[in-house]
């Protein structure tokens, strides 16, 4: 837990930090990448790097740069055009980051990910190893979504979500999301001049979504996506700071403890590596709607999910696939590796353990999902 002492946050002990910088902070009013701005960010990142922090950078800006290079007046809305813009702009984005970091004798590495890379266990572990090697070599990974090959089914959707997933993957001590807003307000400051900036909130507080607003022209993420990302990072035990990138030397100042932005705290212990991989599944093979008793058993008692607690089986999945468990309102409770196919799950849903044997006529696990193979939300 990050402490606040004498009006300052104790962030200096956060060694491994994922920093996400939004499009509006990297582009010149929509006129392509802003070299001066990126050089300014490189200086701040270099200062943290040289102070011993391990920085993983998630950088937006590829689509915005591609739009300028192709002389497009507005952001494309269809996926193929977005993919083409990203492919064109990514060349300029990574070249710029590499050049400005080289000015500080720091090497950069390009890492492109899709959700499918993290959902596949082998690729997830491979990317973990690659990122760890880069960190060990004191190279700064510059991460972006691999828009060119992503489809709607395997997209993160925005770099806020990607940053949260990476924070869990690398066991980060802190996620910093830099945006054009000061942080989280108790109401939309664009419509309420009396809106107050929240200094510290709990990432799990549902009321936060009611306070969030929409996104800008060049980026995909508004405050809603940032709140969702903070909650996702919190599931891995990683706190999130959302702050304005327009504040002078914001990275150095927040790491020195200055109370800028909004800190999203977590009261969850860090998940195991296997649980973090499970939590990385934004899309799953199927869904189990569970009753209130099962929700309580999972969330409060950390029990396995038994067939008796399952009300509805949705989707087609095989034994060992990752599925999500939701309550009767559709809110995600957990994700886990299921011990039965969707066909068998449909047969045994709602049955007590003694009847499962009778119906299936074979000895097998009594749990629909064992607690050791479950990530709780």
Curated annotation (Swiss-Prot):
Location in or out of the cell: Cytoplasm
BP GO terms, sorted: L-proline biosynthetic process
Gene3D superfamilies: Acetylglutamate kinase-like, PUA domain
UniProt xrefs under InterPro entries: AceGlu_kinase-like_sf, Asp/Glu/Uridylate_kinase, G5K_ProB, Glu/AcGlu_kinase, Glu_5kinase, Glu_5kinase/COase_Synthase, Glutamate_5-kinase_CS, PUA
Membrane spanning stretches: none
Residues that bind substrate: 60, 147, 159
Name of the protein in its database record: Glutamate 5-kinase
Organism field: Acinetobacter baumannii (strain SDF)
Higher taxonomy: Bacteria, Pseudomonadati, Pseudomonadota, Gammaproteobacteria, Moraxellales
